[in-house]
Amino acid sequence: MTLSSLGDEYLATVPTGRSVTPHWESGAEFRDEIFVGGLWRRGTGSLIESVDPSSGKIFATLHGAVEADVDDAVDTGLCAVRQSGWADRLPHERAAVLHRIGALIDAEVEQIATLQTIDTGKTLSETRALARSAAATFRYVAAAVETMEGAVTPSRGSYLTMSTHEPMGVIGSITPWNSPIASDAQKIAPALGAGNAVVAKPPVWAPWVTLLLARICERAGLPAGVLSVLPGPGRTVGDAIVRHPGIAKVTFTGGTDTGRALAHVAAEKLMPITLELGGKSPTIVFEDADLDQAVAGIMFGVFSSSGQSCIAGSRVFVQRSIFDEFVNRLVTATNALELGPGTDPRTQVAPMVAFSHRDNVSAMVDEAVLQGAKVLCGGMIPDEPRLADGAYYLPTILSVTDNSAPICQQEIFGPVAIVLPFDNESDLVDQANDTVFGLACGLWTTDFPRAWRIAKAISAGTVWVNTYKQFSISTPFSGLKDSGLGTEKGRDGIRSYMNQKSIYIDTAGQPLPWARTADNR
Ligand code: NAD
């Protein structure tokens, strides 16, 4: 099935004025093919039915991979990095390929964004931004790889000592459905840039854009076999990747329970693993905050992407002196948010990725209400007829008095914010840190010494002050506590796909004295 087979009605909603005909091969986006060891072939695994969450209609089907494909992909990946010379290619030569991948992504932003919007429901403005960010990631990694240096370390004898970095081999990349092209780029670009092969497993709910990225990598001149893309279920294909003895490292983004299970397997193999996991991030409004800025930032932080974001600022702590005024403003602004399909440029809150996920979010809210949470807005599936066919959920604000309520402790991964009052800094820090997660935090205040104090006191990998959900590929990203293990992005993120090696080179030109050879006796 191709994009154009979706019909004129769909195409009329693509607001770009550009053709959506694929630039490389007509219909390539939805070909029923997976990418194993440099070859496109029909999968023999279970059938994936891709549903447009704004209409409930199946727009494409794909046969997924099976465990045997993992063996093929890893074996070919190992050969490919060696035989193609990818691992030994000079950094500026690898960088040239990454630059071309970035340029091709940029040239195809509309194509990629449209594909991802159909697959995930997200707004086109968001999927365009994700595609541009993926291009920027490849360019950043290209520049960083080309300029990375090893070290000549201070010597303690007659030898030259060096610290160098080498590729690891084949990297397993396992990603979730919420921001596919950006998650892929964040893992695949540094892993390739470091000279590795990659076996990528995209999620069942959003496999297409990763397959499209593989076609772009092929066009950019990435040697055959260096990248494989194996869509399929996590419990079979994903599990086989993590357990495979030829996989040197796994980089995973997804839920905390899944990440913990993968970490056990990695421990058995003594294999490094990077985990980017779930969150329940606090966002904090002090009485001296610019309230317009805070309302806009908090809404963006929790309701953009329909709340399907690991860093969603889902616990909103408001100083008691402004609690009523601030919450009223937040509720009024939230009620005015525009719901609709991701293809409509007016849409702020698009459908959720899948009906079953929407229903889980709805059930969690219902349960919270039974346990005493008060619904300040939303709290239900919208009843507007125009939204009846999509996986929509109203942006919701719940009020609870106590951060120990289950709804304050569990990740919802939907458009649901919980407001809680606080009295002073120590009460706030105790409550904000009272969760198993430690991913992100937002602070809204004009008192900068206070912003500094609280930023240091909160257990989170990222803290935003008077802004939220802003990212830079050059700035490391990591989660504390149950939110993750290891770091992505930045130069350290690239190094995490390399083995460090120390080399000692003798400069004396003499046998070591201990051996007492004829010359030194
Ligand atoms: P998930 O854990 O269900 O799945 C993530 C990926 O892991 C999918 O590709 C899935 O098929 C695969 N998988 C599942 N079981 C597996 C197994 N046993 N072995 C190997 N692979 C397996 O998560 P999800 O529902 O796709 O994504 C939502 C979660 O991701 C949320 O918890 C969210 O917070 C988290 N997330 C975290 C970040 C971050 O950077 N910290 C970013 C985005 C999403």
Listing of model-derived features with the role each one plays in the protein:
Residues I58-A65, R82-W86, S173, T283-F286, ...:
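Short, well-ordered beta-strand elements within core beta-sheets of diverse protein domains
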Residues T2-S55, A80, M380:
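Hydrophobic face of amphipathic alpha-helices that form TPR/SEL1-like repeat modules
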